[in-house]
Amino acid sequence: ATNDVITAWIPAQAVPIEMGPLTFAKPLEAYKFVEDIEFNEFDTSYDKKISDVFKNEQVSIVEEPFELGEVSFHHNLSFHTAPENKTTQSRIVLANTYFADGARVIKNPTMISGDWKKFIPETNPGEIVSSDLNPICWPVINQI
């Protein structure tokens, strides 16, 4: 798998704290504290374990509102989440993910990998990402 991945998180409106803006754990290496915690889609035990570890390790959590027009660019190793939207208005966001030419799907995708098959169709774990939905924007060219 590659670590050459970045996501642009683009809200379509202002996102106040009550709406659940994108939230980050800092520093970037914070993911290492929780990378072995097993994801559970049926309850909140995963979230509780993450919260407990970050508290014990004194990991800083950055939660700030987004103004209209602001964009977040974040690395795939940056531990992030979007808290619950406590308003009656939908939180509308476009997330575009970009990765290096030659990137591969991780060999063992998990529930936390999300619905990756929807976004990288016709590609199996361990294979180079190559599908009609994932065009090469800037190909790597062998240089002498």
Residue ranges and their predicted role:
Residues F39, V71-F73, L77-I144:
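Non-heme Fe(II)/2-oxoglutarate
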Residues N3, Q13-P16, E57, E70, ...:
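Residue-level signal for the start and early helices of compact helical domains
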Residues A1-I17, P65-L68, F73, N96-D101:
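Short, conserved beta-strand element in jelly-roll/cupin
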Residues V5, G20, R91:
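Conserved catalytic motifs of the protein kinase core domain
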Residues V15-F79:
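Double-stranded beta-helix
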Residues V5-A14, E41-S51, Q58-V62, I106-W116, ...:
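Low-complexity, flexible helical/coil segments
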Residues T2, P11, P27-A30, E84, ...:
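Short capping/connector residues at structural and topological boundaries
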